[in-house]
């Protein structure tokens, strides 16, 4: 089957206008808080192409007989180059307004209300996983801090990720392969025969064995700590201390647990390149079949997916973390 693509610009299909000029189309889907991105490289022969305005919405689809949407992106950069004469259009899923610094306080709010309010400010829909929706935030300051950074900080404290994707602000579990509704993502199976290239890198296990977080005890008016152990019970364990002082013991412990999950993640990295598959998305669980059993016979979560379409065909490159 021959791979195909389509691109719409502010809702208008421009595929036929650029098909004979397309040199490459790249979509990078990121797990976690990084913004998903899109890059379109076109031949600028004749220099008569109409260029997109800053903030133009592009929707990209890839596939074969049936095309799959890989998201919507706002253009934020156009680059000209010679030789050869080319135009590179870059776009991202995160709105520029997300970078604007703000100062405000969030008091006696549940996370669902915070996410909903920020999403509305940026004309986004929102989806939040049920396990986070009703968590109460007694007090949290946003001081000269962008909404992107603030939500990242809030999400990290609760073992979640928060990012705009496809016009929706997400607040979902980190690396658990679930949608915002709590539904498990389908396990992606990749056979070694599908791979055109792959690599596996083992990294030294993190040095920290204990996480300490601080909080204000209202009853005594003093600063106290909570501890979360990772792999050791030794008194000589290396300690990671979280700088933030939390308003409650529960929030401090939640943040310590989330920090522990992050420190233990990604101790083995796997990268696999296969023939293009538009059904593969970041955060999905992966099962590798027929690869070297040690250390690749384990559970994986996709950290990033790069879809690339050009004259040579359509490939999908995935980068995975071990999720055990």
Model-derived regions: residue spans:
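Assembly/oligomerization scaffold segments
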Residues: 1-96, 195
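An acidic/polar, Gly/Ser/Thr-rich interaction patch typically located in mid-to-C-terminal regions
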Residues: 21, 25-50, 194-324
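Short, compositionally biased
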Residues: 74-82, 176-178, 299-311
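Short solvent-exposed strand/turn elements
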Residues: 86-100, 312-324
């Amino acid at each position: 089957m021959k791979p195909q693509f389509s691109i719409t610009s502010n809702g208008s299909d421009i595929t036929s206008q650029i098909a004979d000029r397309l040199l490459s189309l790249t979509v990078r889907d990121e797990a976690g808080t990084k913004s998903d991105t899109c890059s379109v490289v076109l031949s600028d022969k004749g220099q008569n192409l109409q260029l997109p305005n800053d903030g133009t919405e592009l929707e990209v689809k890839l596939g074969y007989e049936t095309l799959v949407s890989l998201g919507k992106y706002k253009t934020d950069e156009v680059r000209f180059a010679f030789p050869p004469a080319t135009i590179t259009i870059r776009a991202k899923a995160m709105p520029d307004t997300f970078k604007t610094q703000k100062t405000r306080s969030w008091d006696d709010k549940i996370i669902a209300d915070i996410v909903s309010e920020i999403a509305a400010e940026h004309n986004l829909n929102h989806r939040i996983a049920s396990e986070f929706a009703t968590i109460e935030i007694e007090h949290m300051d946003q001081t000269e801090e962008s909404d992107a950074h603030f939500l990242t900080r809030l999400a990290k404290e609760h073992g979640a990720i928060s990012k705009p994707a496809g016009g929706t602000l997400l607040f979902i579990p980190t690396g658990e392969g679930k949608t915002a509704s709590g539904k498990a993502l389908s396990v992606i199976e990749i056979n070694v025969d599908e791979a055109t290239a792959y690599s596996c890198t083992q990294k030294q296990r993190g040095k920290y064995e204990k996480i300490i977080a601080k909080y204000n005890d209202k009853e005594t008016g003093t600063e106290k700590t909570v501890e979360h152990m990772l792999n050791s019970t030794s008194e000589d364990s290396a300690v990671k201390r979280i700088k933030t002082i939390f308003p409650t013991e529960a929030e401090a412990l939640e943040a310590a647990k989330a920090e522990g999950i992050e420190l233990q993640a990604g101790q083995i990295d796997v990268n696999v390149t296969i023939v293009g598959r538009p059904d593969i998305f970041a955060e999905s669980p992966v099962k590798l079949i027929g690869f070297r059993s040690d250390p690749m016979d384990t559970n994986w979560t996709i950290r990033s997916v790069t879809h690339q379409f050009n004259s040579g065909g359509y490939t999908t490159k995935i980068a995975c973390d071990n999720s055990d």
